[in-house]
Regions:
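Hydrophobic alpha-helical segments at protein termini of multi-pass membrane proteins
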Residues: 1-242
């Protein structure tokens, strides 16, 4: 069995399914009687995210070497960060998703699928080469960063569509994504100063975890409540709402 493929599936797809269960179980059956979203729609849009993430990863395989070019790396990081988030907006910014609280969850599903595909491809792609244990751990860390950031920024873009302010929140997600890619530039550099790669990965991991925590556990419950009230509705079973 291809070890790289197995690890890519475990980290990319396996972690995505675990995250999906951990986050969404408080908003659907059997935890509550009236789910906050449609399960079939969520899985469809998760599949769309997998497709988009695959296309973006193909683009990544052409762009990553440019990260090492002085000056050009910053431009590529900014452009790639923007492309990822606007891809989510193009998918979510439909009339059927505008102004409804469900969209926040669909944004999560879309971003999670996109991040899972990126993580899967990244691990499989990098592990085709001969990497030592330390390098393998670094690649896995990078892949998990994409998974967390994808899901979190999906919620941010979804919030914008739900609040009928898509561009405002998408630009916020773009800033997060661009900051993440800029921080990670040293990871791609060919240098003997290996500690700079560690610092970049740790800083990017901290940023991804912070954005994920803020989006999922701080923002999501409040946004659901706000959008429901915007539509003249209210619920007292929103998980995490104080």
């Amino acid at each position: 069995m291809d070890t790289g493929l197995a690890l890519a599936a475990l980290i990319g797809l396996g972690s995505a399914l675990v995250l999906m269960y951990a986050v969404l179980r408080n908003y659907t059956y059997p935890k509550i009687e009236e789910p906050f979203f449609s399960d079939p729609t969520l899985f469809k849009i998760f599949t769309v995210g997998l497709f988009e993430g695959t296309l973006l990863f193909v683009l990544y395989t052409y762009l990553w070497q440019l990260f090492t070019v002085v000056g050009l790396g910053f431009v590529v990081a900014i452009l790639f960060g923007a492309i990822i988030e606007f891809a989510k907006l193009v998918t979510l910014n439909l009339k059927r998703f505008s102004g409804i609280s469900d969209t926040i969850f669909y944004g999560f599903g879309l971003g999670l699928g996109l991040g899972a595909a990126m993580a899967f491809g990244m691990i499989y792609y990098w592990l085709k080469g001969e990497l030592d244990v330390t390098s393998t751990i670094m690649v896995v860390m990078l892949a998990l960063q994409y998974l967390l950031l994808g899901a979190a920024n999906g919620v941010v873009v979804g919030e914008g569509v739900a609040r009928c302010k898509p561009m405002e929140f998408t630009l916020q997600a773009v800033l997060y994504s661009e900051a993440f890619h800029l921080i990670n530039i040293p990871f791609y550099m060919e240098t003997d100063v290996i500690w700079i790669k560690y610092v970049a990965l740790i800083a990017a991991s901290a940023l991804a975890v912070f954005i994920f925590y803020r989006a999922i556990y701080r923002r999501l419950p409040k946004v659901v409540d706000d959008v429901l009230k915007m539509n003249g509705k209210t619920r007292n079973d929103i998980y995490g709402l104080k």
